[in-house]
Every structure is written in C-alpha cells, then in structure tokens.
A protein has these predicted regions:
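Acidic, proline/glycine-enriched N-terminal capping motif
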Residues: 1-90, 98
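Internal amphipathic helical hairpin motif
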Residues: 65-99, 157-189
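Membrane-targeting and insertion segments and their boundary/processing signals
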Residues: 41-45, 96-99, 103, 187-194
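Acidic active-site catalytic centers that drive phospho-/nucleotidyl reactions
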Residues: 53, 102, 205
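Conserved, structured C-terminal
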Residues: 1-26, 30-34, 108-371
Length: 371
C-alpha cells in the first residue's frame, strides 16, 4: 500500500506539526514517534502523562432489544451481566476456539453497546459480528466517523478534569471508576469518556465525532503542558503495553492461538454459551501443549519471530520483545512447551545466530503502584 492510499486520522496535521515520524500501520499513516524519541515518551507516560491518537481503531455499535444477548453470545466475557456505564475486555473467537480479535465492549445505554476492535481487523471483525448477530440487533460500523484520543499516566485525571464536563450532575471525571464510561463534553465537544487504556497506567479514552477531534486534542495538550504531558506514538505505545503484559493481535494472539495457551482464560465465561466456547472448554480440560511466558533476556533484545532454545533444541518462538525503559531490562513474551513454562526456567533466545541467555519470569514486568 502506497502512502497515497493510506488513511489519515483527523489529527494527521497535528502530528506533522509536532514533528512526528509517520509510518504505515494497518492501512493508516500513523505517528511512530515524536522528536524526543520513544524512551522519553515512554517515561512521560509512566511519570506524568501522554496523549495518544487512536483514531485508527475500529468502532462497531450493536443496538436494539436483542443487543444484550447477541453481544453476550458473540464475546467470551460476561456481557449479559455488564451494567450500563461499564466496559469489559473480552475476545471474539471462532468455532474452533481460536482468537479472531481481542476487544473492549462498552455498554453505553440499556440497548446500545460499543465494541472497539483492532485497526487491522475491522473488516474481518465486522463480517464476524454480522454473521453471528444476524437480525437479532442493529449493527453500525462507525470506525470512520469516530475519533479516539487517549490520555494515560498518573496525571491523566488532573489533565482530563480541567477540560471535561460530565453530563451527570455533581460528578467529576476523577469519580469515574476503572472500566467506567460516561457521556461528557471534552474541550467543548460531545464525547464518551472511558477509564480504560493499554499502557498499564491510569488513564482515559475519549470517543469523539471525527470532525471534532482537533479541539479536544489541542486543549488537552495545553492543559497538560505544565504537568509534563507529551504526545505519544505507536513505538512507545508498544513498549508500554509490553511492560504491562498486554497482548498485541498479530503477535501474542491470532487465529492460530487459543485463550488458554495465551493466558487469557480469565476472559472466558465458560458458564455461558458463546462462539467457540465448547472448543475452548476442551482445551482447558485437557490442558494446552504450550503457554505464553515472560522472559528477561540477558544478552540482547529479542524480537518477534526469534526462536527460543532449550538444550540446543528450538522449543518456541518470541512473540514480542523490547528493552523495557521502566524495568531497565530486555523483556519478551514467547510461547514455549508447558513443561518449560515454570518461572525460573533457564532458556535461550537465538539472536543473529547466537544463543543468548533468557529466564522465565512473572508478568506483568511492570505494575503501577496502587493509589
């Protein structure tokens, strides 16, 4: 896909003005980093705040009297029990019990659900949703009508509160519970604000009309200027999520992986019926052949696709790897046989034809302190 055919978010001009390096990603031209670099951006989110343009993500609305049960059967987690004004992480699975995508479902109204899907999977997910929901509910793809801005970090709530007015009287954005979602005005624009994110820090995601994104973006940057806010590209977004041990579709999870081996059994509400439930239950009963583990790599930076070695034999593969700026170590996620998945197991990763030492460790690599 050439640059001329790449999609651009409504904030493209803002990124260019800020000096961002723009790269192709999932059919979009997105900022990978800004002039100060990925490590500086990463540390800003851990220590203060960062603002992200996530408008490339997909948004699908499911509405109507049949929406609750339709989405509950579609998603692995308990959606039937999800209260209005709450969100829940879950999986879209196929009948084989492997992962079509990981999503967050927001219950905005009694009969209105918003499913946020990964940018690379919008068309595939939309077809999957339509196939399984059928005529039970109304489905709307709002991906190109919805802008998404995230503010993440320990100072996110202070920054958000200065430019946000909730539609609920006598409430502030700081009152919003984790995985809560509420109607609001952000920088003067109507929005839904959720206390969700992909960094391992406290933070918010703001869903806005596509043509109203620039005002809130500039207001949030201005409001957070004295508090250390920085614009954050996809590069730091990846290092942040990896330290927090969040899965990336196409790396840790895809249609060749099941939730049990991927460490996502907790998202599967096996007491209910959902697409792929029976196949997943069978894997859980017999046990998976492999599991995803966290690694600390001593002699280099492991990358996606690098081989994991034990006793001179290739036993697995790295799904993601980086230097973790917060933890100060080279970290990775990898699939290995169950017998080698125990914390403390000594392995190696083959980097440039050289086997470097690696050790299985507990994840997440970084967990923010409770406040």
């Amino acid at each position: 896909m050439t640059t001329a055919t790449l999609l651009r978010t409504p904030l493209y001009g803002e990124h260019v003005a800020l000096g961002a390096k723009m790269v192709p990603f999932a059919g979009w031209e997105m900022p990978i980093q800004y002039p100060d670099g990925i490590v500086t951006e990463h540390r800003a989110v851990r220590g203060a705040a960062g603002i992200f343009d996530l408008s490339h993500m997909g948004e699908v609305y499911v509405r109507g009297s049949g929406a609750r049960m339709a989405v509950d059967r579609l998603v692995s987690s308990d959606i039937a029990g999800l209260e209005k004004g709450k969100a829940r992480y879950g999986l879209l699975c196929n009948e084989r019990g492997t992962i079509v995508d990981d999503v967050i479902v927001y219950r905005l109204e009694d009969e209105t659900y918003l499913i946020v899907v990964n940018a690379s999977n919008v068309e595939k997910d939309l077809a999957h949703i339509r196939r399984h929901v059928g005529s039970a509910a109304e489905i709307e793809d709002a991906s190109l009508d919805t802008a998404l801005i995230a503010v993440q970090g320990p100072r996110a709530s202070v920054i958000m509160s200065s430019v946000t007015d909730l539609e609920i009287r006598e409430a502030t954005i700081e009152d919003l519970a984790p995985f809560g979602v509420v109607a609001a005005r952000v920088g003067g624009a109507r929005a839904h604000v959720a206390r969700t994110g992909y960094t391992g820090e406290d933070g918010f995601e703001v869903f806005l009309p596509w043509d109203r994104a620039v005002g809130p973006w500039t207001r949030l940057l201005a409001a957070g200027g004295a508090l250390g806010i920085r614009p954050i590209g996809l590069g730091a977004r990846d290092t942040l999520r990896l330290e927090a041990r969040f899965s990336l579709y196409g790396n840790e999870i895809d249609e060749t992986t099941d939730p049990i081996e991927a460490g996502l059994a907790w998202t599967c509400h096996l007491e209910k019926d959902f697409v792929g439930r029976d196949a997943i239950a069978k894997v859980k009963e017999r046990g998976p052949a492999r599991r995803i583990v966290g690694l600390v790599v001593e002699g280099g930076v492991a990358r996606h696709g690098h081989e994991v070695v034990h006793g001179g034999r290739i036993v697995g593969q790295v799904t993601s790897g980086t230097f973790g700026p917060t933890v100060g170590k080279n970290i990775a996620l990898a699939y290995v046989p169950v017998g080698l998945a125990k914390v403390g197991t000594e392995l190696a990763v083959r980097i440039r034809e050289r086997d470097v030492a690696a050790r299985v460790v507990r994840t997440p690599f970084h967990k923010r302190e409770a406040t």
